[in-house]
């Protein structure tokens, strides 16, 4: 932006909508964190890692793909996976197809933890995200999220395609 140019300030309605959205961006993860701690004894990020692995083919993902899915730096993910390894829920090993990569695999105990934890997580997601919205609003939420993701990352479509391949999902 040109330093002499005046910023395009938000009007009153935009300010109000931004405030509501920004507050939701803080409160939704906090509510999911509280639920995961209360019901499963783990953090929401750890649950997200376990859940992602549970959906992956053979319950295994490259750490780099898992980092992308969780929108996390590899260092944060590595610390979380170390905690999960100590509980025998995940194990890591070099990727036999390409030793430059590390694979994270969900163990049987890890899968059992996901199966025990998932109902509470889904109930909380439903309570705070889906139940307050009509079906039309839910669809619109998905469209809005996609547009925002593309504004953040213009080639989001290719990121989405890589995630679908990693998880064995057809789009």
Describe each PLM feature range:
Residues 1-12, 135-171:
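C-terminal regulatory/oligomerization modules of transcriptional regulators
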Residues 1-42, 89, 169-171:
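N-terminal leader segment of winged-helix/HTH proteins
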Residues 3-6, 82-140, 146:
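Charged, amphipathic alpha-helical coiled-coil/dimerization segments
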Residues 10-13, 42, 61, 106, ...:
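Alpha-helical hairpin
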Residues 16, 48, 139:
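Active-site phosphate/pyrophosphate-handling residues
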Residues 30-73, 160:
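N-terminal helix-turn-helix DNA-binding core of bacterial DNA-binding proteins
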Residues 63, 81-82:
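Short, hydrophobic-biased segments on the C-terminal half of alpha helices
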